[in-house]
Amino acid sequence: MDNLKSLTQKENIILSDIALEKFEIYRKLILEWNEKINLTAITDEEAMNTKHFLDCLLLTKTGLFDDDKTVLDVGTGAGFPAIPLKLYNENLKITMLDSLNKRIKFLNIVIEDLNLKNIKAIHGRAEEVGRKKVFRESFDIVSSRAVASLSLLLEFTIPFLKVNGLFLAMKGPSYLEEVENSKNALKKLNCKLENVLNFKIEQNGEISERNILIIKKVGKTPNNFPRNMGQIKKKPL
């Protein structure tokens, strides 16, 4: 994993030798399970290090992941960004949410094989789990790398946050347009865009843009959110 070590050092992200070893185990598990269930189209080691692992670890540049905060990762898939964040700082208390049970099975094996504590994977849809008292308004940070519009992600994620908690959305170059289209959602869900961190990642001469939107919850979520998927599709915020 020398490639990952050099990539992270360039961004001043420090990983322990143990963390680097666990990233290698994690990578092999992804490749093994990718033959059974669809986890990622990126299977080349160098590309995985750049487009998955480093990309997720850029979240640590916010300075928000250096203690024992409670973190929820919505639509976690193969565990991105939850597992890389946990390997960066094992003190984080992380919950991973995904709607596909096969991925939950995979994530539980990752947790076991990497010997991770204070991290769990739960099966469910965000718009349903977000209405449950045990999860609602109970996290310091919610992250999502899911491919969905910002307004949709806001309705899926903001209900999970404590007041003054932060939602971190990972977006590509068209984020300004998404923010503009999400003004109504931001207002109705009692949150505001606090900051945007911009990064450029290079791999084999190809440069990709990554933007981390930091959105703060400034008031309690109204009881009617999140709505069911039928309502969300019929009338998006």
What spans do the regions from the language model cover?
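Class I SAM-dependent transferase core
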Residues: 2-68, 72, 105, 109-119, ...
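Short loop/edge segments at beta-strand edges and connector loops
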Residues: 43, 123-125, 195-197
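Conserved SAM/SAH cofactor-binding pocket of Class I
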Residues: 57-148, 154
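Helix-to-beta-strand junctions that scaffold the AdoMet/dcAdoMet cofactor pocket
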Residues: 89, 161-163
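Short alpha-helix immediately C-terminal to the canonical SAM-binding loop
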Residues: 103-105, 175, 179
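Short "lid" loop at the C-terminus of a central beta-strand within the Rossmann-like core
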Residues: 127, 172-176, 201
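Conserved beta-strand signature within the Rossmann-like core of class I S-adenosyl-L-methionine
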Residues: 164-174
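SAM/dcSAM-binding transferase cores
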Residues: 180-237
